[in-house]
Amino acid sequence: MDISNQLTLEQEFELVLYKQKIDPLNLEQAQNLLVETLKTMMLKDNIIKYVVKNSHFR
């Protein structure tokens, strides 16, 4: 079984916190939060790609 696509307990907890943060928002606020979250994920991807590309362990 491939567990790489499963969330850790900590990540599951983080999802619950996000849901609690999103529930009271109106549509526009939720959309803005989504855009900011996606931007953060993209920046994280860029950092990971940079580290892998510049890693001395290739």
UniProtKB/Swiss-Prot annotation:
Keyword Chloroplast among record annotations: yes
Assigned keywords, A-Z: Chloroplast, Plastid
Transmembrane segments: none
Signal peptide (UniProt feature, chain positions): none
Species classification: Eukaryota, Rhodophyta, Bangiophyceae, Bangiales, Bangiaceae
Keyword match Chloroplast: yes
InterPro entries: NblA (IPR007574), NblA_sf (IPR036904)
Compartments, as annotated in UniProt: Plastid, Chloroplast
Pfam families linked to this entry: NblA
Name the record gives this protein: Uncharacterized protein ycf18
Family: Belongs to the ycf18/nblA family.
Organism domain of life: Eukaryota
GO cellular component: chloroplast
